[in-house]
From Swiss-Prot:
GO terms for cellular component: cytoplasm. Its EC number is 2.3.1.180. Pathway: Lipid metabolism; fatty acid biosynthesis. Catalyzes the condensation reaction of fatty acid synthesis by the addition to an acyl acceptor of two carbons from malonyl-ACP. Catalyzes the first condensation reaction which initiates fatty acid synthesis and may therefore play a role in governing the total rate of fatty acid production. Possesses both acetoacetyl-ACP synthase and acetyl transacylase activities. Its substrate specificity determines the biosynthesis of branched-chain and/or straight-chain of fatty acids. Its main location: cytoplasm. One of its GO terms (biological process) is fatty acid biosynthetic process. Residues 238-242 are annotated as: ACP-binding. It catalyses: malonyl-[ACP] + acetyl-CoA + H(+) = 3-oxobutanoyl-[ACP] + CO2 + CoA. PANTHER family: 3-OXOACYL-[ACYL-CARRIER-PROTEIN] SYNTHASE, BETA-KETOACYL-[ACYL-CARRIER-PROTEIN] SYNTHASE III, CHLOROPLASTIC. The keyword Cytoplasm applies. This is Beta-ketoacyl-[acyl-carrier-protein] synthase III. It is found in: Cytoplasm. GO terms for molecular function: 3-oxoacyl-[acyl-carrier-protein] synthase activity; beta-ketoacyl-acyl-carrier-protein synthase III activity.
Length: 312
């Protein structure tokens, strides 16, 4: 049995915060932000929109796309570091709101790699025959944990949600291979402080990300018995255009074969990969049978990569 994505959905907040807006809030400039990160604007959820609201909206779209009823979902996994509260989890909240009453539900905290962790977890339950359908959501309200007076981090983050329904797919399709990893020794480089503000050692995180994104991408290709020439599209975590480009160059892919949404959404952590995948599918850039590599890294430090052949 092969597990793969059979439905996708996303939620993007309406409010746009541009680099020019940030120039009025903190000592920075549009040119400085664009040249160092590739970000031009990001979306910010309104005060009355919580993480669970965004997760629910993306989940409903994914279920509709998969043509799967909520009552047929066996497990809900929500990847987030910005839950509404410690408990109940976002997964349990949307379980109730969706009416997915037979599903078990839990949140996963692996920062920007969380969606990868969720997909791999769901894959195991489906391919073991334990569950038939697993809903995986990556969602963040990072504006809530951003220090808007810190020019180094205020320019980076945005809010949003992406969701995928996992189910059985045809032989040769779906998730072909994966790699998950963590290195707690690097936790001090990216963390939440006592004021609930994101603190980042940009230089160290950059070095880690460039190395690990490239290595993990190559590893999953080899595990799947493929070569770089077999890869049709790269969906990297949308953290920084320079990190993304390093991963693309490691795979020797042309620019048009890499997803880029960082310029309009910023870094949405666990939501960035599903949002990007959803947009590329809708734009017709990914076709049935295409080999996709998805790769992300995050606080922990954590990382994850997946090689997938698209289609049902």
């Amino acid at each position: 049995m092969n597990a793969g994505i059979i439905g996708l959905g996303r939620y993007i907040p309406e409010k746009v915060l541009t680099n020019l807006d940030l120039e009025k809030m903190v000592e920075t400039s549009d040119e400085w932000i664009r040249t160092r990160t590739g970000i031009e604007e990001r979306r910010i959820a309104s005060d009355d929109v919580n993480t669970s609201h965004m997760a629910l909206a993306a989940a409903k779209k994914a279920l509709a796309d998969a043509d799967v009823a909520a009552e047929d979902i066996d497990m809900i996994l929500v990847a987030t570091v910005t839950p509404d509260q410690a408990f109940p989890t976002v997964a349990c909240m949307i379980q109730e709101q969706l009416g997915a009453h037979k599903a078990c539900a839990m949140d996963i905290s692996a920062a920007c790699a969380g969606f990868m962790y969720g997909l791999v977890t769901g894959k195991q339950f489906i391919e073991s025959g334990t569950f038939k359908h697993v809903l995986v959501v990556g969602v963040e309200k990072l504006s809530r944990i951003t220090d808007w007076d810190d020019r180094n981090t205020a320019v980076l983050f945005g809010d949003g949600a992406g969701a995928a329904v996992l189910g059985e797919v045809s032989e040769g399709k779906g998730i072909l291979s994966f790699e998950l990893g963590a290195d707690g020794r690097g936790g001090k480089h990216l963390y939440l402080d006592e004021k609930d503000h994101t603190i980042m050692n940009g230089r160290e995180v950059f070095k880690f990300a460039v190395r690990q994104m490239g290595e993990s991408s190559v590893n999953v290709i080899e595990k799947a018995g493929l070569s770089k020439e077999d890869v049709d599209f790269l969906i990297p975590h949308q953290a920084n255009i320079r990190i993304m480009e390093a991963a693309r160059e490691r795979l020797e892919l042309p620019v048009e074969k890499m997803s880029k949404t960082v310029h309009k959404y910023g870094n949405t952590s666990a939501a960035s990969i599903p949002i990007s995948l959803c947009e590329e599918i809708e734009a017709g850039k990914i076709h049935d049978g295409d080999v996709i590599v998805m790769v992300g890294f995050g606080g922990g430090l954590t990382w994850g990569a997946i090689a997938m052949r698209w289609g049902r």
